[in-house]
Amino acid sequence: MYEALLVVFLIVAIGLVGLIMLQQGKGADMGASFGAGASATLFGSSGSGNFMTRMTALLATLFFIISLVLGNINSNKTNKGSEWENLSAPAKTEQTQPAAPAKPTSDIPN
């Protein structure tokens, strides 16, 4: 479920960025004189503004709701972790007693 929500979250984020980039700014009236007239658009002269604004608000709401749900799911996950995920802790090593020094077989020192 977490992965599916993450995919939906990414799609909503990309759609939100796309919708924001497609909207005309407040000072976009100058573009009409250079051939970017509103009469040739899909929604007419004023129809796209309302549609784009509502879709942006809807996607922004979905973005915030899904981000809160993903954060809640992520904070409630239990750490099952494998031994490869926690490499900062040193491995337990077996410590043995050092071997006793060998007793000389002769009385002549080396």
Curated annotation (Swiss-Prot):
Changing F43 to S/Y: Affects activity. It is a multi-pass membrane protein. One of its GO terms (cellular component) is membrane. One of its GO terms (biological process) is protein insertion into membrane from inner side. It comes from the Bacteria. Belongs to the SecG family. This is Protein-export membrane protein SecG. It comes from Escherichia coli (strain K12). The gene is secG.
